[in-house]
Amino acid sequence: MMVQHLKRRPLSRYLKDFKHSQTHCAHCRKLLDRITLVRDGKIVNKIEISRLDTLLDENGWQTEQKSWAALCRFCGDLHCKTQSDFFDIIGFKQFLFEQTEMSPGTVREYVVRLRRLGNHLHEQNISLDQLQDGFLDEILAPWLPTTSTNNYRIALRKYQHYQRQTCTRLVQKSSSLPSSDIY
């Protein structure tokens, strides 16, 4: 009686094949040009991948593969790197993709500006409370970076539009809930 041995390969080899088989970003569905591999929400670079020498058979890979995702570089940065608390960057990105006719490059520009601004405001120790009322571009004017100020103002106005749309949708959802005459 002969025992069948399943072929075992290093995890790094499975990942190389996985990387080449992915055609679209797992988050935004954009056609992939350059890929960021992510395991359980953490970016894994090519040096780390080359060190993954655990031997797996096909069944082991099928289980392991569920932990991995291929993202475009943009989504990798957004979803896996620390963001400031000033802006809902991921929600803003989704809004721009789904509710506007902007090209992916333009969406990327607005998101990058807002993320940089959030980091800048954090470094300046600006309080989140200052973002509550009024027009963001006017409220934050004293703290905007001196270069590309108009670009930051435009991004802030787009973000404020996103906030208004989000609030409107929340109000519409809550008003459509059933209510009782008793209360």
Curated annotation (Swiss-Prot):
A Pfam family annotated for this UniProt entry: Phage_int_SAM_1
GO molecular function: core promoter sequence-specific DNA binding; sigma factor antagonist activity
Disulphide-bonded residues: none
Induction: Induced in early post-exponential phase, its expression decreases again at OD578 2-2.5.
Disruption phenotype: Not required for motility, disruption leads to derepression of the adhesive curli fimbriae genes.
Biological function: During the post-exponential growth phase transiently interferes with RpoS (sigma S) activity without affecting expression of RpoS itself. It is probably not an anti-sigma factor as its overexpression is detrimental in rapidly growing cells where there is almost no sigma S factor. There is a strong overlap between Crl-activated genes and FliZ-down-regulated genes. FliZ acts as a timing device for expression of the genes for the adhesive curli fimbriae by indirectly decreasing expression of the curli regulator CsgD.
Designated name of the protein: Regulator of sigma S factor FliZ
Species this chain originates from: Escherichia coli (strain K12)
